[in-house]
Amino acid sequence: MSELRTLPVLPLRDIVVFPHMVVPLFVGRDKSVRALEEVMRGDKQILLVTQKNSADDDPAPGDIFEVGVLATVLQLLKLPDGTVKVLVEGKARAAVVSFTDQESYYEAQIGEVSEDDGAGPEAEALSRAVVEQFENYVKLNKKVPPEALASIPQIAEPGKLADSIAAHLSVKIGDKQNLLEIFDVVKRLEKVFALMEGEISVLQVEKKIRSRVKRQMEKTQREYYLNEQMKAIQRELGDPDDARDELIDLEKRIKKTKLSKEARTKAESELKKLRNMSPMSAESTVVRNYLDWLLSIPWGKAKTKKIDLVESEGILDADHYGLEKVKERILEYLAVQARTNSLKGPILCLVGPPGVGKTSLGKSIAKATGREFVRMSLGGVRDEAEIRGHRRTYIGSMPGKVVQSMKKAKTTNAFVLLDEIDKMGSDYRGDPASALLEVLDPSQNSTFGDHYLEVDYDLSQVMFVTTANSLNMPQPLLDRMEIIRIPGYTEDEKLEIAKRHILPKLAKDHGLKPAEFIVPDKAIRDLIRYYTREAGVRSLERELGALARKTVRDLAREKVASITIDDERLAKYAGVKKYRYGETDEVDQVGIVTGLAWTEFGGDILTIEAVKMPGKGRMQITGNLKDVMKESIAAANSYVRSRALQFGIKPPVFEKTDVHIHVPDGATPKDGPSAGIAMALAMVSVLTGIPIRKDIAMTGEITLRGRVTAIGGLKEKLLAALRSGVKTVLIPQENEKDLADVPQTVKDGLEIIPVSTVDEVLKHALTGPLTPVEWNEAEEPITTSAKKDDGDSDAMLTH
């Protein structure tokens, strides 16, 4: 290596420059332009180094290869768009010793790499072989200019020969960089020879593929010509027997099927078109598939069964325990249909957490009405064509899910359950929710248009029922449906469901007789309390399924006649308890409140923690809280400060104290205003030092005047409180009327206290009374450096 020198660096993307190469480059990055400007002020020497990742716009020294080329700038031209066109000539290999950041560009300390002259018989033999191989390569690769064949053989120096050929190879940047980093001339020639051999093999395969494709195209054109001749002959001689039989069969089906006038005209037109086509043509297959779909869906085929309300009620009661109000509304719906013999009523939408029986309720309604049940899953549907079908111009086109469901039902008055309607999405392919508007509108669905069928189809006799976990769907879609909420089950209801439905099903699935698998009520209750925490019964079914599997195993292992799941076996089979039930903190604590939340999966408890520390009056909020909950905290903060003296808090405390409010389970986003009174209680507790009762939970929105306003999801929240072992729940006075919808077992298990003001909340929740204080501003002034609670970003830090 020669003596070290320092040069500006020009990082290259997607190109490796070799010595003796003259290359035009377009430079647009600021650092690269400034490096060139610096070079032009000096001796026009620059280091060209390839960067490792071509997508990197600002490569660091570690992102650049350590071997490059010392080059001379021959010409530089600034273009109108701010970029620079530069002509460079590679001089010699250079190894980078270190990089220096000059802010506007990088400099590198380099040393030129000395190479041997490559003299010797081995180098001479390799040079001849490489030149011969290069001639073969140029014949196959049309991208190499023909003049290269004239210039390359004239190069006498083996090293220069290897570099010149490497510059013309269509190989990966990494392979070219490897060649640049090979300083031994003989090894470099060997590497170039190996790379050319690999490229020649690939080019030969490409040539074979091109020849094969060309022959295939000629064959296709020949087949087309022969098919046209065959069609002419067929017109003279008549159709073959098979094709004629198929056409006769299609004609009979068209006459037999009760098509609409529009559909019959379309079918006859397509059949006429099919008669004039070759049976072997691709277009005839498309037409045959279309006619098959058109004639396979039901036209005027209806199953009739009079709705018997007593029988329907018996089916609903047999299939589902509890859900009395839901079943009552469904029976009302069926009664109106039975009386009017019409389906012009609202579309029912069953909304509730997972595992509460929405889909099975749909099956029961279908059984009660005597209709064919078809489930149409909409979860993950993002393409409008999945609802309306694809147009026939596309390869592999077919009707949408609605028409496919009708074909499966084989009757025009089927029962179609649109499952998970809230899980649809939309993207550049359209909005499937908008396509459903026509399906679910009784005044429009008699002329439903599927893109594939291209004729109107009558859906007015179909009974549509939808299911969803939440109401997170477009408003026009919601307007077409009547929402029936299915809340979570109480503990007693889960117990009965397990005994009546889950255990018999599991025993049958696992080959167990009732006498072999005995699960007492206590074991089921323990599973509900300590191993599941859900609104539905899916987790309970999984836990009972685990007990059944272990029972089957132990019946074979222990050679006993039956197994009873007592406390010992439950602990052995189910493992460690996953949840606490009926256990509260041992002591009342300052700043820790139990709130109640509603999610699309049911109710849940929401622990809120608050601490104070010396500071400058800042409020810090953590726990993945969204905007509405942050505003609720701000309102609670303002209310507490406005009533500070009545609560026993002197105003200077606010300027000297930082308060941190945290809602655990930070991975789960949280939003909504119903934790307002819990936030206010936490602030008062932490600022006064008075503990909060450990066995109390609450829900309610707060106003700036301290009034407690109504919230939603009361039943789900009370169920969550009961599941969690809370004894007392504070609810807004305005929600007292909603207690009529809450099961009596829940009301019996909780002490429910309606409140209308924050003062009442503090009275019930704090363990001690609040002592008002007096404050003389002259004696204890508020300093001007205190942070004002004006709602700006300085008053509240959120993370």
From Swiss-Prot:
<dbReference type="Pfam" id="PF05362">
    <property type="entry name" value="Lon_C"/>
</dbReference>
<comment type="function">
    <text>ATP-dependent serine protease that mediates the selective degradation of mutant and abnormal proteins as well as certain short-lived regulatory proteins. Required for cellular homeostasis and for survival from DNA damage and developmental changes induced by stress. Degrades polypeptides processively to yield small peptide fragments that are 5 to 10 amino acids long. Binds to DNA in a double-stranded, site-specific manner. CcrM is an important target of the Lon protease pathway in C.crescentus.</text>
</comment>
<keyword id="KW-0346">Stress response</keyword>
<keyword id="KW-0067">ATP-binding</keyword>
<dbReference type="InterPro" id="IPR027065">
    <property type="entry name" value="Lon_Prtase"/>
</dbReference>
<dbReference type="InterPro" id="IPR004815">
    <property type="entry name" value="Lon_bac/euk-typ"/>
</dbReference>
<feature type="region of interest" description="Disordered">
    <location>
        <begin position="772"/>
        <end position="799"/>
    </location>
</feature>
<dbReference type="InterPro" id="IPR014721">
    <property type="entry name" value="Ribsml_uS5_D2-typ_fold_subgr"/>
</dbReference>
<dbReference type="InterPro" id="IPR003593">
    <property type="entry name" value="AAA+_ATPase"/>
</dbReference>
<feature type="domain" description="Lon proteolytic">
    <location>
        <begin position="587"/>
        <end position="768"/>
    </location>
</feature>
<keyword id="KW-0378">Hydrolase</keyword>
<dbReference type="InterPro" id="IPR054594">
    <property type="entry name" value="Lon_lid"/>
</dbReference>
<dbReference type="InterPro" id="IPR046336">
    <property type="entry name" value="Lon_prtase_N_sf"/>
</dbReference>
<dbReference type="Pfam" id="PF02190">
    <property type="entry name" value="LON_substr_bdg"/>
</dbReference>
<keyword id="KW-0547">Nucleotide-binding</keyword>
<dbReference type="GO" id="GO:0016887">
    <property type="term" value="F:ATP hydrolysis activity"/>
</dbReference>
<feature type="domain" description="Lon N-terminal">
    <location>
        <begin position="7"/>
        <end position="200"/>
    </location>
</feature>
<dbReference type="InterPro" id="IPR008268">
    <property type="entry name" value="Peptidase_S16_AS"/>
</dbReference>
<dbReference type="InterPro" id="IPR008269">
    <property type="entry name" value="Lon_proteolytic"/>
</dbReference>
<dbReference type="GO" id="GO:0043565">
    <property type="term" value="F:sequence-specific DNA binding"/>
</dbReference>
<feature type="binding site">
    <location>
        <begin position="352"/>
        <end position="359"/>
    </location>
    <ligand>
        <name>ATP</name>
    </ligand>
</feature>
<dbReference type="GO" id="GO:0034605">
    <property type="term" value="P:cellular response to heat"/>
</dbReference>
<comment type="subunit">
    <text>Homohexamer. Organized in a ring with a central cavity.</text>
</comment>
<dbReference type="InterPro" id="IPR015947">
    <property type="entry name" value="PUA-like_sf"/>
</dbReference>
<dbReference type="InterPro" id="IPR003111">
    <property type="entry name" value="Lon_prtase_N"/>
</dbReference>
<dbReference type="Pfam" id="PF22667">
    <property type="entry name" value="Lon_lid"/>
</dbReference>
<dbReference type="InterPro" id="IPR027543">
    <property type="entry name" value="Lon_bac"/>
</dbReference>
<dbReference type="InterPro" id="IPR003959">
    <property type="entry name" value="ATPase_AAA_core"/>
</dbReference>
<dbReference type="GO" id="GO:0004252">
    <property type="term" value="F:serine-type endopeptidase activity"/>
</dbReference>
<dbReference type="InterPro" id="IPR027417">
    <property type="entry name" value="P-loop_NTPase"/>
</dbReference>
<keyword id="KW-0963">Cytoplasm</keyword>
<feature type="active site">
    <location>
        <position position="717"/>
    </location>
</feature>
<keyword id="KW-0645">Protease</keyword>
<comment type="similarity">
    <text>Belongs to the peptidase S16 family.</text>
</comment>
<dbReference type="InterPro" id="IPR020568">
    <property type="entry name" value="Ribosomal_Su5_D2-typ_SF"/>
</dbReference>
<dbReference type="GO" id="GO:0005524">
    <property type="term" value="F:ATP binding"/>
</dbReference>
<feature type="active site">
    <location>
        <position position="674"/>
    </location>
</feature>
<protein>
    <recommendedName>
        <fullName>Lon protease</fullName>
        <ecNumber>3.4.21.53</ecNumber>
    </recommendedName>
</protein>
<dbReference type="Pfam" id="PF00004">
    <property type="entry name" value="AAA"/>
</dbReference>
<dbReference type="GO" id="GO:0004176">
    <property type="term" value="F:ATP-dependent peptidase activity"/>
</dbReference>
<keyword id="KW-0720">Serine protease</keyword>
<dbReference type="GO" id="GO:0005737">
    <property type="term" value="C:cytoplasm"/>
</dbReference>
